[in-house]
Amino acid sequence: MRNTARWAATLGLTATAVCGPLAGASLASPATAPASLYAPSALVLTVGHGESAATAAPLRAVTLTCAPTASGTHPAAAAACAELRAAHGDPSALAAEDSVMCTREYAPVVVTVDGVWQGRRLSYERTFANECVKNAGSASVFTF
């Protein structure tokens, strides 16, 4: 009987020692700082000749990071980020420039965008009739 009382006391003290700090930690967790102050926006953009990204070899690829500041290997990162912000991160919503005149030559160019925009996964592919149409379709995002 005395051994049972000792075991019960030992288990009670062990449970208090192990679980006591955990209870205090759960009370303190709402006061801790958030892991990140902004949602990540980091993209990889590619361009290649062909009708589909599956069959076209990428000719060029750039990185574009838009949060917290515009950076990456994209030659006009700040302008490209501003255009994507205006389109709410949707590359298909980028406004085409009406003032650009392009030939009707068919030399397909495919662009892809893969990555994360404001914490959401993004995957986009579009085929343009030629390089001129691609550059007119987005002032900065696909001009690299």
Swiss-Prot record:
One of its GO terms (cellular component) is extracellular region. Keywords: Disulfide bond, Protease inhibitor, Secreted, Serine protease inhibitor, Signal. It holds the Pfam family SSI. The record marks 104-105 as: Reactive bond. Disulfide bonds join 66-81, 102-132. PROSITE patterns: SSI. Its main location: secreted. GO terms for molecular function: serine-type endopeptidase inhibitor activity. It is found in: Secreted. Strong inhibitory activity toward subtilisin BPN' and, to a lesser extent, toward trypsin. Homodimer. Belongs to the protease inhibitor I16 (SSI) family. This is Protease inhibitor. It comes from Streptomyces lividans. The gene is sti1.
